[in-house]
Amino acid sequence: NNAMQLIEDQSEQLTGVLPNSYTDFSDEILSELLRIFNNSAIDEVGGDIVGRIYEYFLNKFAKNIASDDGVFFTPKSLVKMIVNIIEPKSGVLLDPACGSGGMFIQSGDFVNQSGMNANSAMTFYGQEKVEYNAQLCLMNMAVHGLTGVIKSGDEANTFYHDAHNLDGSCDYVMANPPFNVDKVKAESSESAKRLPFGMPGVNKNKEVGNGN
């Protein structure tokens, strides 16, 4: 448990994010995990091996969850396609529905592959209503060596709030919008400067339905 606190002490963006109890795991399992990761064969693989391992288990986790809020993690192949089309190079990148942070990871990798340093060239901002998903995002960014500002909770509900006050200030906005979200209150959204083209269909309850 102290190990997690020591990690948080070294990374401001992970403060309050990491789990602080491992009572669900036996000492034998934890010892075996340490033995596996403390293996020279892993070092020999090179590259961002820890980040790739994290992504592997994150994808496994994503396949086993579903939510009435329409929350799901965008497949890596789709994220990669979006990034390759937009080709981010430098500046401010916002994902207003960032989930586990896939857009940031692939954008960072794209920038690094071009010979630049992603943390120097890019500034990452994210909004994620579900706090647990925002924690996954911050951990995902950390194991890939990226920094960013992620806001979560009601203030980060992108249907109603520009949590970072970035209207007109972003170089890139990437997102896989939460199309399944229903009952968005039109009155709380229609005054947003981020919606210059107006609102989609509003029903008799003054709500916007999902995108299906």
Regions found by a protein language model. Give the residues of each.
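Non-catalytic, mostly N-terminal accessory regions of nucleic-acid modification and defense proteins
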Residues: 1-89, 149-152, 157-160
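Phosphate-binding glycine-rich loops and adjacent basic patches that engage nucleotide phosphates
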Residues: 11-21, 39-48, 98-102, 121, ...
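A short, mixed-charge helix-start or loop-turn motif at secondary-structure junctions
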Residues: 64, 119-120, 199
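Conserved S-adenosyl-L-methionine
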Residues: 68-175, 180-182, 187-189
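Mobile active-site "lid"/loop adjacent to the S-adenosyl-L-methionine
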Residues: 179-212
